[in-house]
Design a protein with these regions (language model features):
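Alpha/beta-hydrolase-fold enzymes
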Residues: 164-251
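Catalytic nucleophile-loop/oxyanion-hole region of alpha/beta-hydrolase
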Residues: 86, 112-147, 344-350
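The serine-hydrolase catalytic nucleophile loop
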Residues: 82-95, 109
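Catalytic histidine-centered segment of alpha/beta-hydrolase-like enzymes
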Residues: 335-347
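Short beta-strand/loop motif that positions the catalytic acidic residue
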Residues: 287, 293-295
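N-terminal cap/lid segment of alpha/beta-hydrolase-fold proteins
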Residues: 23-71
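Conserved alpha/beta-hydrolase
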Residues: 96-116
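Short beta-strand element of the alpha/beta-hydrolase
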Residues: 72-81
Length: 363
């Protein structure tokens, strides 16, 4: 045996013990009553489920199953938006797709909602991408799921994470990305980075790094973590229109939920550092499976989907609906960003298109 080969063999004491990493679940406190921001459907069965990710964090999910189904079902895992919980729009998507014949789960990310993980309110491009793959783990072993027919829906900031997961996890056979944010891009460059030159972007990134690392020191000294991203209770008149749109969803009866980070005090501030340093779309151009991007025509965030589509196809859509190979961009006329959370009172979510997409590609 060569010295190089010997280095690849575990020491005898480890071989003898056959040591393995054992998967253990946390005990979670799960709400038993219906506490969603959307009405309960009588067309599906609902139950709470839990599963564990590769980092040992137990995730909580709502599972929806069509009533009176037979055989194994195609399945879809849903998450988002970034800072939202499953009782908000991801659950609405999951329940609606279950009405249309899919077994679905809407899950809370690590450190969020009813899911486990300490400290609370953390975000991570790695761990949150892993959350999607953990959902696929769970769905793959369900007796009523065909493991070769699993897809995902990522909403808002979980759209970028969904693309990251699809680039990594070949078990994901189709991905729908709704009203997408690329959290790495917006964290590193701020909003509307296409309006800035590279020198400005570099200078702003360095200034932000210095502030965030100073915050790390302060957090450690204080023994607490500063939070950011929650929609304020009192919105200033000069707030941007898209922030007012977030307020209209997260802070009103339309979408408020007591466990939602966006509806309350937000998420860990210094987590921005890892998002700045780890681009989510690095291998988007290597995704071989079908991807459907859906965005509102009037959404401030539309450029994220256009950028992702160009990254995957090499074609700039210039704000138009377009199909290149098995990648499709659908622009919803007149819709703003949050209209694709719950329909915005105008049925903006193209559920017929989603049903057609997943029916065609989870076959």
């Amino acid at each position: 045996m060569t010295s190089e080969a010997a280095q690849r063999v575990a020491p005898p004491e480890y071989q003898a013990r056959g040591e393995q990493a054992v998967i253990k679940t946390e005990k979670l406190k799960l709400e038993t009553k219906w506490d969603k921001t959307y009405a309960k459907s009588d067309k599906v069965n609902h139950q709470k489920v839990t599963f564990v990710n590769r980092y040992g964090i137990t995730l909580a999910a709502d599972m929806f199953t069509p009533k009176n189904y037979t055989g194994k079902l195609p399945a879809i895992a849903v998450c988002g938006a970034f800072g939202a919980v499953k009782e908000q729009h991801s659950g609405l998507y999951a329940q609606t797709m279950a009405e249309r014949g899919f077994l679905t789960i809407a899950f809370d990310p690590s450190f969020t909602g009813e899911s486990g993980g300490q400290p609370r309110y953390m975000t991570s491009p790695d761990i949150n991408t892993e959350d999607f793959s953990a959902a696929v783990d769970f769905l793959s072993v369900q007796p009523n799921v065909d493991p070769e027919k699993i897809g995902i829906i990522g909403i808002c900031g979980w759209g970028g994470l969904g693309i990251n997961a699809a680039a990594m996890d070949t078990r994901i056979k189709a991905s729908a990305i709704m009203t997408m944010y690329d959290m790495s891009k917006v964290t590193a460059n701020g909003y509307f980075d296409y309006e800035k030159d590279e020198a400005t972007l570099k200078r702003e990134r360095m200034e932000n790094r210095k502030k965030l690392n100073a915050q790390r020191t302060a957090d450690y000294k204080n023994g607490t973590y500063a939070l950011e991203g929650g929609v304020p209770d009192n919105l200033p008149d000069e707030a941007p229109d898209f922030v007012k749109q977030y307020y209209d969803y997260y802070k009103t009866g339309r979408g408020y939920h007591p466990r939602s980070l966006n509806s309350n005090h937000g998420r860990n501030l210094t987590s921005q550092l890892t998002f700045m340093n780890m681009p989510q779309l690095s291998y988007a151009d290597e995704i071989e499976t079908p991807v459907l991007l859906v965005h509102g025509e009037k959404a401030h965030s539309r450029y994220f989907s256009e950028y992702a589509f160009e990254k995957m196809t090499g074609v700039n859509p210039h704000g138009q609906s377009m199909t290149v190979g098995n990648k499709e961009l659908v622009i919803v006329p007149g819709a703003i960003h949050c209209d694709l959370y719950d329909g915005g009172g105008k049925n903006a979510i193209p559920f017929d298109k989603l049903e057609k997409f997943f029916s065609a590609n989870l076959h």
